């Protein structure tokens, strides 16, 4: 992931978009709530469409791991 970075000194080590303190989680929550990519870009004008798409790719990559659903809820 080129645009997503994890640094223990930034946002407690949460994945963020490089050069910002905007977490991937924040972007994903906007999209999950029904906001469009364009809505996110209006809210965070410093981001690019590629930044938002990278958050989706990052999430998809995490989902490739196998989890027992009982352990997550």
Predicted regions and their residues:
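Short, Lys/Arg-enriched N-terminal segment that forms or immediately precedes the first helix
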Residues: 1-16
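Exposed, low-complexity/repetitive linear segments and helix-based recognition motifs
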Residues: 4-6, 26, 51, 68
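N-proximal short alpha-helices
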Residues: 10-13, 25-29, 57
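Amphipathic, hydrophobic secondary-structure cores in small proteins
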Residues: 23-53
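C-terminal structural segments of small proteins and small subunits
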Residues: 46-73
């Amino acid at each position: 992931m080129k645009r997503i970075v994890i640094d223990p000194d930034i946002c407690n080590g949460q994945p963020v978009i490089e050069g910002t303190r905007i977490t991937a989680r924040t972007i994903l929550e906007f999209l999950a709530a029904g906001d469009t990519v364009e809505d996110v870009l209006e809210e965070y004008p410093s981001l690019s469409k590629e930044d938002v798409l990278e958050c989706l790719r990052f999430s998809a990559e995490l989902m490739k791991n196998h989890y027992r659903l009982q352990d997550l809820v």
